[in-house]
Regions:
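Conserved acidic residues
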Residues: 57, 89, 115-116, 184
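C-terminal target-recognition/interaction regions appended to catalytic cores
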Residues: 307-451
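Class I S-adenosyl-L-methionine
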Residues: 99-115, 125, 129-339
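Intrinsically disordered, low-complexity acidic Ser/Thr-rich regulatory segments
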Residues: 39-58, 152-165, 368-372
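Extracellular structured ligand-interaction cores
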Residues: 2-5, 57, 239-241, 339-341
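Cofactor-binding loops of NAD(P)H-dependent oxidoreductases
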Residues: 94
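Short, solvent-exposed loop/turn segments at secondary-structure junctions
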Residues: 13-14, 65, 123-127, 192-193, ...
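Conserved S-adenosyl-L-methionine
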Residues: 2-87
Length: 451
């Protein structure tokens, strides 16, 4: 029996892909000394990961293009699995604020019943190091539009007190959804930069903990926080994110509640996955420390891809043509194939890193330059590989019968892939929670053939 999952701020579905499993990854990203039992099958290039116990029943994002990309992947995936047309209405486009208000105004069917897990990467632009770091003081509304006191008269006048409907406080509406659906567990993701903004992390943790809480503190949610580095889980990228994980206290066994309430949670009870990869020779103390392998180099996921002009894959054909702006600017460096790739960004104003630079601009990949390969930025497929999206996920989707017209363009695709949680990191989280489900909630998981 699958566990029903509700996905918020879903974007193109990186978290959803990981939590459902059943996708393929290049062999180089998996530590088979530790995770061999995750593999359903393999071929020369890929490992096909097993499905998990989770199934997405509701997804939501304000970006209409996210739905197009999400549906393109998931409907195709589910149709092939079930030999029937998948439900096209799982993904609902719109602001989370408007959807919650729709529920509050009487449409109680807006959210599915029997939701056991809620996930969501609430908007990070206001907390990001690469953004303007407005945090709670964001002056954009829940639709991403700038808030003005009187925009008709003066476009420079801003509101003085951001409300809970501003972009920096949309996690409060995720909280509302959790209060409505009452899942056993929820996972909220954001950028590491949030931890450096004063008391923001503690405030968000306290707000989530307050869900359905009573004075005796026996109800509500027990909320944990931890920063995870994607590179420690095989993702060939330097990407750090904070994960808030909340447990419904009344759903936990007494033993699990006691263990999860400790200042230091044991390896057995923690919901956070144990690292499988080393970054730079740092010391690890986990039970798996002797089985860990070195991080996945960028070369491992990039070297086998054809050059764009030779590829039939639209996500490999199209890439940013923004000109080189000088090494002092963001996104003007060449990916070092022997290291982790830099963080794949969502913004697309000439800040997509280079797959290779010319000699004149400091390029160092002589082997490729000598073959006549041209200076260019990372393609969508290369960004997707670095993020561990499966190769059958399309980030550039052409309009049928219309040459050079797109349902999802390359420019949009860069934003989608850069905003996503790496599916492999999400899979590590999902498998840890799956393996501990009975430990936490006392419910035996009935295994199926491919779980």
């Amino acid at each position: 029996m699958k566990k029903n999952l509700l996905s918020l701020f879903s974007g193109c579905g990186g978290m959803d892909i990981g939590f459902e499993g059943g996708f393929k990854v290049p062999k180089s990203v998996l530590n088979i000394k530790i995770n061999k039992d995750w593999i359903e099958k393999e071929d020369e290039i890929y490992y096909y990961l097993k499905e998990t116990i989770f199934e997405t029943k509701f997804a939501n994002d304000i970006n209409k293009y996210a739905k197009i990309a999400w549906n393109d992947y998931f409907i195709k995936k589910r149709s092939s699995e079930n030999n029937e047309t998948a439900d096209k209405e799982i993904f609902k486009v719109g602001s989370i604020v408007d959807i919650v208000k729709e529920y509050q105004n009487g449409n109680t069917d807006v959210f599915p019943q029997d939701i056991e897990i809620v996930t969501g990467g609430f908007p990070c632009q206001d907390f990001s190091v690469s953004g303007k770091r407005k945090g709670f003081d964001s002056h954009k509304d829940h639709n991403g539009k700038r808030i003005e006191n009187n925009p008709k008269n003066n476009d420079n006048i801003k509101t003085t007190i951001p409300s809970e409907e501003t972009r920096g406080k949309l996690y409060m509406w995720m909280k509302e959804v959790i209060e409505i659906t009452k899942p056993k567990i929820f996972i909220a993701e954001n950028v590491k930069g949030l931890t450096n903004l004063g008391e923001v992390e503690k405030i968000i943790q306290a707000d989530f903990s307050d869900i359905d809480a009573k004075e005796d503190k026996k109800e509500g949610y027990l909320v944990l926080t931890k920063v995870l580095h994607s590179g420690m889980y095989g993702v060939p990228q330097s990407r750090e994110r904070i994960f808030f994980i909340g447990f419904k206290k009344s759903a936990l066994t007494q033993k699990a509640l006691e263990e999860l309430s400790k200042t230091t949670i044991s390896e057995k009870y923690t919901p956070y996955p144990i690292p499988t990869h080393k970054l730079n020779g740092e010391i690890h103390t986990s039970s798996l420390k002797d089985l860990m392998i070195n991080f996945t180099k960028s070369a491992a996921v990039l070297k086998d891809l054809e050059e764009p002009e030779k590829s039939d894959d639209f996500s490999q054909k199209y890439y940013s043509k923004a000109k080189f702006m000088g090494a002092h600017c963001q996104g003007q460096k060449e990916v070092d194939l022997e290291k982790l790739a830099p963080t794949i960004r969502a913004e697309h104003h000439g800040n997509i890193e280079y797959r290779r630079l010319s000699k004149e601009n400091g390029g160092k990949i002589n082997e490729e330059l000598e073959k006549g390969y041209q200076e260019r930025r990372l393609t969508l497929r290369e960004c997707a590989r670095i993020q561990t999206f499966p190769d059958d996920y399309n980030f550039v989707i052409p309009k049928k019968g219309m040459k050079n017209r797109f349902e999802v363009s390359a420019s949009v695709g860069y934003k989608l892939v850069g905003n996503a949680v790496p599916p492999l990191l999400a899979y590590h989280l999902a498998k840890k929670i799956e393996s501990n489900w009975e430990l936490y909630f006392g419910e035996e998981i009935k295994k199926t053939e491919n779980i």
